């Protein structure tokens, strides 16, 4: 009888041990799953940049944007009968005219999912940005048509103006001077700079990679408001407004969360999950 009791106790102990091992195993699998999910979401922050760096499709879309822009410009020039002001186009610089993806890729490969303001400030101050696919040929043709070109960028004027002008000149871009390169000082909203140009010029085209590059009053708006504004201006895209693709960064990020770029990875992942499943 004593021997049977001992065997029963041993069986209970073994059963409990297996059960605990199962619980630990389940917890471990859950932890691995969560860690993998976090890594996947964090890595997806660089997938858009990787697409810009490597894909033929990205280059094709850039060429398509500039081909469309030139056709739209020619049509607008023909359809404008009265000309009280000189013709002009307005376009953004970074990821519209100037390509910074190599520098961003180097930064991201060091484990930095997003590039902060100080890094961006220092990087653009080096003046080593490349030309975007199709940008130089397009702007040379615009200039040959007698249309003025204005570069309206949110690079920081006090520090980055001269180096930006030099970078554009080195690459051969026309109208690279202080009268045509308008950076920001106190206000990153481009609307006041657009209005200033529109007083003296008839602006036929706007080009950019961000919704704020167009005269839509979109700065500071929520995701839903941004989408509504775009929807109500649908007829202007592909005609008066030409958008270049940029899945790597932009005001759409801060529209998800004002402090997104400063959040730790897990907090960013929470924001990502929220909108991926919304």
Predicted features, each with a name:
Residues 1-4:
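Positively charged n-region of N-terminal signal peptides that target proteins for export
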Residues 95, 135-168:
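Substrate-recognition element of Asp-dependent hydrolases with the DxDx(T/V) motif
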Residues 51-62, 121-129, 150-156, 182-184:
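Second-shell loop/turn segments in exported
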Residues 88-91, 98-99, 148-153, 182, ...:
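Structural recognition of the beta-strand scaffold that forms the well-ordered cores
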Residues 16-91, 257-278:
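Non-catalytic pre-domain segments flanking phosphatase-related domains
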Residues 56, 161-278:
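C-terminal cap/substrate-recognition subdomain and adjoining C-terminal extension
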Residues 79-86, 97-129:
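Active-site neighborhood of HAD-like aspartate-dependent phosphohydrolases
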Residues 9-17:
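Bacterial N-terminal signal peptides
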